[in-house]
C-alpha cells in the first residue's frame, strides 16, 4: 500500500495567497457593482463625461466646418452652376431651333408664292396661246369657208351658164323639129333666162 506524501509548506503558502487575491478581486468587483453599476451611469464621472463630450462635439463641429461643409458647398455650387449652364444651353438651343423654324417657314412661304406665280403665269400663257390659236383657227376656217363659197359660186355660175347654153340649144332644136320654127339663139337664151328667174323666185 502506497503511503501519501504531505505537500511542502511553500506550496501551501502560494495556494493560500492566490486564493486571497481572487477573493480580493471578487470583493472589489462586488463593491463596484454595489457602488453604481455601469461607469457611464455613475454620477461621480459626469463632469468628466461632459468635458469629453464637449471636446468631441467641438472637434466634430470644427471638422465639419473645415472639411465636410466646404465640400458640400462646393458640390452644391457646382451643381447650381451646371444647372445654370444647362438652362443657358437649353435657351440657346431653343432660340436656334426657333430661328431655324422661322427660316423654314419663311422659305416655305416664298416657295409657295413662287409656285403660285409660276402656275398663274403658266395658266395665263396657256390661255393666251389657246385664245391665239383659236383665233388663228377661226380665221383659217373663215378663209376656207369664203374660198369654198367662192368656188361653189363659181361652179354654180359655170353650171348655170352651161345650163343656159344647153337649154337654149335644146329649145332651138325642139322648136325647129316640133314646130318647124327657126328660133334665134339669142331669143332662145332670153327665154331660158326668164324661165330660170321664175324658178328661182318660186324656190325662194
UniProtKB/Swiss-Prot annotation:
Membrane topology term: Single-pass membrane protein
Assembly mode: F-type ATPases have 2 components, F(1) - the catalytic core - and F(0) - the membrane proton channel. F(1) has five subunits: alpha(3), beta(3), gamma(1), delta(1), epsilon(1). F(0) has three main subunits: a(1), b(2) and c(10-14). The alpha and beta chains form an alternating ring which encloses part of the gamma chain. F(1) is attached to F(0) by a central stalk formed by the gamma and epsilon chains, while a peripheral stalk is formed by the delta and b chains.
Keyword flag Lipid metabolism: no
Subcellular location: Cell inner membrane
Residues annotated as transmembrane: 50-70
Role: F(1)F(0) ATP synthase produces ATP from ADP in the presence of a proton or sodium gradient. F-type ATPases consist of two structural domains, F(1) containing the extramembraneous catalytic core and F(0) containing the membrane proton channel, linked together by a central stalk and a peripheral stalk. During catalysis, ATP synthesis in the catalytic domain of F(1) is coupled via a rotary mechanism of the central stalk subunits to proton translocation.
Cysteine pairings via disulfide bonds: none
Family: Belongs to the ATPase B chain family.
This protein's record includes keyword Signal: no
Protein name per Swiss-Prot or TrEMBL: ATP synthase subunit b 2
Species, as recorded: Rhodospirillum centenum (strain ATCC 51521 / SW)
Pfam families: ATP-synt_B
This protein's GO CC annotations: plasma membrane; proton-transporting ATP synthase complex
Gene3D superfamilies: 6.10.250.1580
GO terms, molecular function: proton-transporting ATP synthase activity, rotational mechanism; proton-transporting ATPase activity, rotational mechanism
Keywords tagged on the record: ATP synthesis, Cell inner membrane, Cell membrane, CF(0), Hydrogen ion transport, Ion transport, Membrane, Transmembrane, Transmembrane helix, Transport
